[in-house]
Amino acid sequence: MNPYRSTIFWFLASFFFVSCAKETIITNNDAPNYNEVSTLLIENYVNRVYIDFIGREPLDSEMVLEVGKLKAADLAFDARRKMIENLQTDTSFIEGDSSYRRAYYHRMYNLSKARVIEGASNSEINQKMGIIKAQMKQDSINGNWAAYDENKRKVEKYQKVLDCDHEFEQGLIYIDSVFARMINNGIYDFINMNSFNFVNASFDNLLYRFPTGDEFNRAYNVIEYNQTELIFGQGASNKDEYIQAMVASSNFHEGIIMWLYQNLLQRFPNSAETAHHLDYFSQTRDLQEVQVQIAISDEYAGFD
C-alpha cells in the first residue's frame, strides 16, 4: 500500500473509533500528576459531585467509600465515571433519598423548573390546578362548556409539568419533552405575558440567545395569529407546534449542552466542546452521558 494512503487510512480509522466511543472525553493535553492530588481535593470533588447530581453532600460513610475507591484507582477517569453513574442509576434504597437514581432525577426536575419557571414548587402548581378545577366545576354548573374545556387544557398542562419528575426517570420522555412542558403552562405564561415576551423568553431560556428579526416575526405570527410559518425548519401554526419545533431543533440541543456546562462548570462551552457533544446528544438525547463527560474532567474535579 502507498505509505501516504496508509497514513491517511489509519488516521481516518482512528478518528472514526474515537468519535463514536461513548467514553470519549476532552481533557488537557498535559495531564497532572495525580499522585500529588491531596485528599482534601479528592474530598472536595466527591462533595461537588454529590451536590450537583443528587442535591446533597455525601454522608461521612459515603465520603470515606468514594475517596477510597478513587485513591485505589489513582483517580482514573473510569473510577470517576463509576461514581457518577452510580448516583444516576442505582436503585438501592437510601434512607432520605429513596435511591440515588430517584434523588438524581428529582434534582434534574428541580433544575429544569429553576431554569424556566423560577423554581415553582409542586405545591404552588397544585394550588393553581385546584383553583382552575374549582372554576371548571362552576363552568359545568353554568353549562359553559367552552370555558370548561379551556380550563381542562390548563389543568392538563400543569399536570404534565408535575409528571415530568417520574416520566423522565422512567424513560417515557426525553429532556426535550421536559422543557416543552416547562414553557407551555400558566406559570410560564404569567412570567412572560403576551406573545412578544413569550417569543423572546423562549429563545433566551432554551437557546441562550434572542431571535433574529425574521425568527421573531415568524414565531410571533404563529403564536399571536395561529398563522402557519416555518420555524426551525418545521411548519408550525400554533403555540404547541412552535414549542415542539423549537425543542426538536439543533439550536435547542446546543442550548442543553450550554445549560449543562453552566450547571457544572459555571461557564459556557467553547465551540470545540459543543461540537464534541452535539452530534452524540442530537442522536441519543443522552443527557446523562454529557453530564458524566463534563464531571469526570480534571477541570470539574479541580485536579488540573
Which positions does each model-derived feature cover?
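Composition-driven recognition of low-complexity segments enriched
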Residues: C20-D304
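Bacterial Sec-dependent N-terminal signal peptides
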Residues: M1-N33
